[in-house]
Design a protein with these regions (language model features):
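Long, charge-rich intrinsically disordered scaffolds of nucleic-acid metabolism proteins
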Residues: 1-74
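Phosphate-backbone recognition surface of nucleic-acid-processing proteins
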Residues: 83, 87-140
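Cytochrome P450 C-terminal beta-domain/meander region
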Residues: 71-79, 126-130
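Residue-level signal for short amphipathic helical patches enriched in basic/charged
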Residues: 32, 36, 66, 81-84, ...
């Protein structure tokens, strides 16, 4: 990956980490029994949300750089894929080289798997739970 792609991946990782911490902080805020603690949690949540917005803007700026722009724009042509989802997909597509689309689908945990025993096949195939959890979470 180029320096621009590496910066994009670091920003995406930071965004995901802060978003996860913000969700945990919201749970603490909800469970707080003390008014002062709840107030402190609310201030922290507000600061985290502001930082998430700043990071989102920086990610958008990074996707406008020459090494990222074309790939992200192509991914955005897919229905229901926005800038953030396209940026995450672009990061995963460029950080690993996939020989076929089937290999990428397996990496993302989007390939169907059938349950079979010997010659019998039980039911229809379902999506596997294998693959990259973070990538699958962005897509669903």
């Amino acid at each position: 990956p180029t320096d621009e792609q590496y910066r994009l991946s670091r920003m995406i990782a930071a965004y995901a980490q802060i978003k996860s911490e913000c969700a945990a902080m919201k749970n603490r805020h909800h469970a707080a029994k003390d008014e002062e603690a709840a107030k402190a949690y609310a201030e922290i949540i507000k600061a985290m949300n502001e930082q998430l917005e700043v990071l989102k803007e920086k990610i958008k700026e990074q996707t406008e750089k020459p090494n990222c722009k074309e790939g992200v724009k192509r991914l955005e042509t897919i229905p229901a894929i926005g800038r953030m989802t396209a940026a995450v997909l672009f990061h995963h597509l460029t950080s690993s080289k996939f020989e076929t689309s089937n290999k990428f689908a397996a990496f993302a945990g989007l390939s169907p798997q059938q349950k079979e025993s010997g010659t019998s096949v039980r039911g229809k195939g379902k999506l596997t739970k294998f693959g990259n959890r973070k990538l699958r979470a962005v897509l669903f």
